[in-house]
Amino acid sequence: MAQFVRNLVEKTPALVNAAVTYSKPRLATFWYYAKVELVPPTPAEIPRAIQGLKKIVNSAQTGSFKQLTVKEAVLNGLVATEVLMWFYVGEIIGKRGIIGYDV
């Protein structure tokens, strides 16, 4: 047991250095995209979002969504899935657990 602990202590700095070296470029890439993608909308973008929602409601009322190409339908489905998953992640964070609320 003592030899195992000694080997672990000897290898720890090398493992930490390898982990830091491996993760630095990936962390930089993550921060780059996080700063761009996770910013709240500006006041100038809100009217465009409202127009987009009105367009979706209008297409549902008139049935024009049936004229979408397969590519557009798949992209719309992916966006809807992303929105639902972010909602679900927020619920998990709010509940502090995957299943149920603490009562």
From Swiss-Prot:
GO CC term, one of those recorded: proton-transporting ATP synthase complex
Keyword Membrane included in the entry's annotation: yes
Keyword Oxidoreductase assigned: no
GO biological process, one term: proton motive force-driven ATP synthesis
Residues with the N6-acetyllysine modification: K11, K24, K35, K54
Protein keywords: Acetylation, ATP synthesis, CF(0), Hydrogen ion transport, Ion transport, Membrane, Mitochondrion, Mitochondrion inner membrane, Transport
Pfam families, A to Z: ATP-synt_G (PF04718)
Main location: mitochondrion
Chain positions with N-acetylalanine modification: A2
InterPro entries listed in its UniProt record: ATP_synth_F0_gsu_mt, ATP_synth_su_G_mt_met
Subunit structure: Component of the ATP synthase complex composed at least of ATP5F1A/subunit alpha, ATP5F1B/subunit beta, ATP5MC1/subunit c (homooctomer), MT-ATP6/subunit a, MT-ATP8/subunit 8, ATP5ME/subunit e, ATP5MF/subunit f, ATP5MG/subunit g, ATP5MK/subunit k, ATP5MJ/subunit j, ATP5F1C/subunit gamma, ATP5F1D/subunit delta, ATP5F1E/subunit epsilon, ATP5PF/subunit F6, ATP5PB/subunit b, ATP5PD/subunit d, ATP5PO/subunit OSCP.
Stored PANTHER family: ATP SYNTHASE SUBUNIT (PTHR12386)
Family (UniProt): Belongs to the ATPase g subunit family.
Entry function: Subunit g, of the mitochondrial membrane ATP synthase complex (F(1)F(0) ATP synthase or Complex V) that produces ATP from ADP in the presence of a proton gradient across the membrane which is generated by electron transport complexes of the respiratory chain. ATP synthase complex consist of a soluble F(1) head domain - the catalytic core - and a membrane F(1) domain - the membrane proton channel. These two domains are linked by a central stalk rotating inside the F(1) region and a stationary peripheral stalk.
UniProt-recorded name of the protein: ATP synthase F(0) complex subunit g, mitochondrial
Organism listed in the record: Pongo abelii
